């Protein structure tokens, strides 16, 4: 078994994430999530992630949802949405297994959506 300290977790990687237990309207269950924290943060045992959910056409008008088409690089099996409104810091222990990585172009869209959600300039 690989120890937590041996896992390399980088911005833009997609990991299976165990969200439970959740409270209220928090997105739950085991699902993909993208690491959005900067690699410059060093070896903290926490990562900032944005959960990924199945795409729904109503998300077309939602500025914080970033559409992702499945491909061999990202490891997703369905058209998906990165929910930047549900961004959170989580223990690396919640990140189970890397399944892929996002393109630089998609990460730029994620950064833009995070800027809107957090009201900060990119």
Describe the residue ranges of each PLM region.
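Conserved functional hotspots at enzyme active or ligand-binding sites that engage polyanionic ligands
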Residues: 1-122
């Amino acid at each position: 078994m690989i120890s937590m300290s041996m896992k390399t977790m980088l911005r833009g990687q997609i990991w299976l994430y165990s969200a439970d237990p959740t409270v209220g309207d928090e997105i739950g269950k085991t699902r993909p999530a993208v690491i959005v924290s900067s690699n410059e943060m060093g070896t903290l045992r926490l990562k900032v992630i944005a959960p990924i959910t199945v795409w729904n056409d109503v998300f077309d008008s939602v500025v914080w949802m970033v559409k992702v088409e499945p491909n061999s690089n990202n490891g997703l099996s369905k058209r998906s949405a990165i929910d930047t409104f549900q961004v959170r810091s989580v223990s690396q222990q919640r990140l189970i297994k890397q399944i892929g990585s996002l393109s630089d172009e998609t990460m730029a869209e994620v950064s833009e959506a995070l800027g809107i959600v957090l009201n900060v300039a990119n």
